[in-house]
């Protein structure tokens, strides 16, 4: 099949959140299944120097009263085709925000539709989040192009209808209240980025005022879990890690831990319980919960906490104050550093994700891959990926709590601290976490099933049966799993 992915991000060149990882990593797995997969994104300023871009555009046109051109490039790692929509509105390196954000992405959606109609016509146009939300509305007129819309985060829903009417000249009934609603109404299939999140968003608590619409379209809604690139994220080969390691030589992690402690200004002591967090510092990620429990945890245990990220000023200030009050035990770097984030994954003992809501989450998958035990709230994709620790039966991959309450989070932290003191069982827990299967292989197979379904291809793919071989959270190496349980 010919499949075109349209999005605002594509890792590793342009990445802010999990959407960039999906758009960057899903195509290679689909290509291995025999499909012609390409990606179209806005031509942000820095991309023209990062990528080998064609000298001449492959397509020129006009939409929404402005000229644009589409250029062809290749993904720097996986070598599949990427199309860049060129227009001065994208010349800045700023991806989100700004006064013209609504116009920019509506223009990008319109340009993508023109390109798909008149240049490279896909069988499936796979749209991601509100930035591409108007594409299914326009493509609904074309029976030859089927649309799939992926919800990465329902909280961000795009411009409201009065703006859309002025920008697109579409009457209000063509897009409901905003572009997210428009996409869900008109897309042929809709998916969320985890099965649990697909169920949650149909409830009042997580539906962001769209639960009625989501229940109405539930027949075409499903959840497909994100994956990670196991080659890119491999602690045995990661060039950033000072000490490479695998389940066969976990003792090497201690060297990474000491270096992490030193770089973040913590007391260098491998026996201390080191908690890591790499996150946007926003309410969604439960940073306020961490602020509420940290003082008690540091007072009653010998734990250390290392935080990396940027976000809301009041949360940054709270974390900074903790670092001042607990030198050598609490450290925060208010930036994003890929090398340091990998060191946190590969050197911390446990990883914090006390999220209010979590559509899928990539960090817990990376933490497990690198032997850092996730401590998570049972919500969204965290339910689908982290199994509660059961030391009596040698089962589980992390520590979980249900309510978004300080006492629940604190209890999980203390339980994990106590478990850390039992080195043999902790090592088994690390090995179970590190051997979980969360590659893109299963995700690609599930997307393929959805693509064929939406295109009306009745005969099952010969690869569909393979889906059943990969249950979420099973060991990547069954023989190894038996040896460590």
UniProtKB/Swiss-Prot annotation:
Pathway: Glycan biosynthesis; glycogen biosynthesis. GO terms for biological process: glycogen biosynthetic process. Signal peptide: none annotated. ADP-alpha-D-glucose binds at residue 15. It is an enzyme of class 2 (transferase). One of its GO terms (molecular function) is alpha-1,4-glucan glucosyltransferase (UDP-glucose donor) activity. Keywords: Glycogen biosynthesis, Glycosyltransferase, Transferase. Gene3D superfamilies: Glycogen Phosphorylase B. The keyword Repeat does not apply. It catalyses: [(1->4)-alpha-D-glucosyl](n) + ADP-alpha-D-glucose = [(1->4)-alpha-D-glucosyl](n+1) + ADP + H(+). It holds the Pfam family Glycos_transf_1. InterPro entries: Glyco_trans_1, GS/SS, Starch_synth_cat_dom. Its EC number is 2.4.1.21. Synthesizes alpha-1,4-glucan chains using ADP-glucose. HAMAP family: Glycogen_synth (MF_00484). Belongs to the glycosyltransferase 1 family. Bacterial/plant glycogen synthase subfamily. NCBIfam families: glgA, PRK00654.1-3. This is Glycogen synthase. It comes from Prochlorococcus marinus (strain MIT 9215). The lineage of its organism: Bacteria, Bacillati, Cyanobacteriota, Cyanophyceae, Synechococcales. The gene is glgA.
């Amino acid at each position: 099949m010919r499949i075109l992915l349209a999005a605002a991000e594509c890792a590793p060149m342009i990445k802010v959140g999990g959407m960039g990882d999906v758009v960057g990593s899903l195509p290679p797995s689909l290509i291995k299944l025999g499909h012609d997969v390409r990606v179209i994104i806005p031509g942000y300023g820095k991309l023209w120097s990062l990528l080998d871009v064609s000298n001449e555009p492959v397509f020129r046109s006009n939409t929404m009263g402005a000229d644009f051109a589409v250029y062809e490039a290749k993904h720097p790692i996986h070598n599949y085709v990427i199309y860049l929509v060129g227009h001065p509105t994208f010349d800045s390196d700023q991806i989100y925000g700004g006064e013209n954000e609504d116009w920019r992405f509506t223009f990008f959606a319109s340009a993508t539709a023109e390109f798909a109609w008149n240049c490279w016509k896909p069988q499936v146009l796979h749209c991601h989040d509100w930035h591409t939300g108007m594409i299914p509305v326009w493509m609904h007129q074309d029976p030859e192009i089927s649309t799939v819309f992926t919800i990465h985060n329902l909280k961000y829903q795009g411009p409201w209808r009065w703006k859309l009417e002025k920008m697109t000249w579409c009457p209000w009934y063509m897009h409901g209240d905003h572009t997210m609603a428009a996409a869900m109404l008109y897309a042929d299939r809709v998916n969320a980025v985890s099965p649990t999140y697909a169920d949650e968003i149909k409830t009042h608590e997580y539906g962001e005022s769209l639960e009625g619409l989501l229940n109405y379209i539930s027949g075409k809604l499903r959840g497909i879990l994100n994956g990670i690139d196991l080659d890119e994220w491999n602690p045995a080969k990661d060039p950033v890690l000072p000490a490479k390691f695998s389940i066969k030589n976990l003792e090497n992690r201690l060297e990474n831990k000491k270096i992490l402690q030193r770089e973040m200004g913590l007391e260098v002591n491998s026996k201390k319980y080191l908690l890591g967090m790499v996150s946007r510092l926003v309410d969604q990620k439960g940073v306020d919960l961490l602020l509420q429990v940290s003082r008690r945890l540091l007072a009653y245990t010998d734990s250390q906490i290392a935080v990396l990220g940027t976000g809301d000023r009041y949360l940054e200030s709270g974390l900074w104050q903790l670092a001042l009050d607990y030198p050598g035990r609490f450290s925060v770097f208010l930036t994003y550093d890929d090398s340091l984030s990998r060191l946190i994954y590969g050197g911390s003992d446990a990883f914090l994700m006390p999220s209010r809501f979590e559509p899928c989450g990539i960090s817990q998958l990376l933490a497990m891959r690198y032997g850092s035990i996730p401590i998570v709230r049972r919500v969204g994709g965290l339910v689908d990926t982290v199994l509660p620790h059961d030391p009596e039966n040698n089962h589980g991959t992390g520590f979980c709590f249900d309510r978004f309450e300080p006492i629940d989070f604190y209890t999980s932290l203390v339980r994990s601290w106590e478990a850390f003191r039992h080195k043999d069982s902790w090592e088994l827990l690390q090995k179970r976490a590190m051997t979980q299967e969360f590659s893109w292989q299963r995700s690609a197979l599930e997307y393929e099933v959805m693509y064929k379904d939406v295109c009306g291809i009745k005969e099952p793919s010969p690869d569909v049966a393979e889906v059943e071989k990969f249950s979420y959270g099973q060991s990547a190496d069954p023989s190894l799993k038996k040896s460590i349980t």
